[in-house]
């Protein structure tokens, strides 16, 4: 397995593979890898000749372009991540620093703007977040030129934004969304889970419980009670609700449903537990 720290090292490794018409799967990550990332790599390994994984904590998608505690405290464990990726059969790891990605200033002159799609839900709480995501992903697509790229369904809005990026900018690749991986207690796997204390993790379990209840209601034809779900999260000790919304599964446009659900939908949510912000979602299928 090659670990490329520069764009030149990456391109030197990939150019012969493109010449040989080997299929390439890209798994973009910010490191602090877990079983959810491993599932992305496994899917990429299954569908491609070559798997490339990027590890880059992207300051552009954090508050104040990374000048914040969330960016500074984001888990970084490159050696452990590289060992995991080698065990999972990854061929190339691209692990640049900020200057390598964005030049001496650490900021690009040109950005991808995601507009209204990137300004609601997660984007309302994290202004500019999806512009930063789309910008770095566009750069990775240009550098790697993958046939397929793999993202976790846990970040449902990110998946929708990236699909739109590919469509609007005519990137010649497929986007694969891989189902959420959950721990035995139901919590969605996330790099941020490392920062939860035992008490915080116990408090956070209210989120999957609320989502599973909504899933059951949809599947059995019961009326959805979105406001009741919000109330449960607001009342939970140690938890602060950011948002919980019912949206169209494809467009993420808000949905208003009275009575039983009559179309596929998604519930997306974010909460704060201690100093950690967690996101989750669940697909709802009507009876």
From Swiss-Prot:
Enzyme superclass (EC): ligase
Functional pathway: Cofactor biosynthesis; (R)-pantothenate biosynthesis; (R)-pantothenate from (R)-pantoate and beta-alanine: step 1/1
Residues spanning the signal sequence: none
One record GO biological process: pantothenate biosynthetic process
Pfam family for this entry, one: Pantoate_ligase
Keyword terms of this UniProt record: ATP-binding, Cytoplasm, Ligase, Nucleotide-binding, Pantothenate biosynthesis
Keyword Aminoacyl-tRNA synthetase among record annotations: no
GO cellular component assignments: cytosol
Residue numbers annotated as active site: 37 (proton donor)
Keyword hit for Cytoplasm: yes
Amino acids binding beta-alanine: 61
CDD domains: PanC
EC number: 6.3.2.1
Residues at which (R)-pantoate binds: 61, 158
Subcellular location: Cytoplasm
SUPFAM superfamilies, alphabetized: Nucleotidylyl transferase
Miscellaneous comment as given in the Swiss-Prot or TrEMBL entry: The reaction proceeds by a bi uni uni bi ping pong mechanism.
Function according to Swiss-Prot or TrEMBL: Catalyzes the condensation of pantoate with beta-alanine in an ATP-dependent reaction via a pantoyl-adenylate intermediate.
Protein name: Pantothenate synthetase
Native species: Corynebacterium efficiens (strain DSM 44549 / YS-314 / AJ 12310 / JCM 11189 / NBRC 100395)
């Amino acid at each position: 397995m090659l670990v490329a720290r520069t764009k030149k090292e990456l391109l030197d490794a990939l150019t012969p593979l493109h010449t040989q018409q080997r299929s390439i799967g890209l798994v973009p990550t910010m490191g602090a890898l877990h079983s959810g990332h491993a599932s992305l790599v496994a899917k990429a390994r299954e569908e491609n000749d070559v798997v490339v994984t990027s590890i880059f904590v992207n300051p552009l998608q954090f508050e104040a372009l990374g000048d914040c505690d969330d960016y500074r405290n984001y888990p970084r464990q490159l050696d452990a991540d590289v060992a995991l990726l080698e065990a999972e059969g990854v061929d190339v790891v691209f692990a640049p620093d900020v200057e390598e990605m964005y030049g001496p200033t650490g900021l690009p002159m040109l950005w991808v703007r995601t507009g209204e799609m990137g300004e609601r839900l997660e984007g309302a709480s994290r202004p500019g977040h999806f512009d930063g995501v789309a910008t770095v992903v566009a750069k990775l697509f240009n550098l790697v030129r993958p046939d397929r790229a793999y993202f976790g369904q846990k970040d449902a809005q990110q998946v929708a934004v990236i699909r739109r990026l590919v469509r609007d900018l005519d990137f010649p690749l497929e986007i694969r969304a891989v189902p959420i991986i959950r721990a035995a207690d139901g919590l969605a796997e996330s790099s941020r889970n490392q920062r939860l204390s035992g008490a915080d993790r116990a408090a956070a379990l209210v989120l999957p419980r609320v989502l599973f209840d909504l899933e059951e209601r949809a599947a059995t034809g019961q009326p959805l009670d979105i406001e009741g779900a919000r109330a449960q999260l607001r009342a939970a000790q140690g938890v602060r609700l950011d948002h919980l919304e019912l949206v169209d599964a494809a467009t993420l446009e808000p949905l208003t449903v009275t009575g039983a659900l009559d179309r596929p939908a998604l519930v997306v949510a974010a909460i704060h537990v201690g100093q950690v912000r967690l996101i989750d979602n669940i697909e709802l299928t009507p009876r």
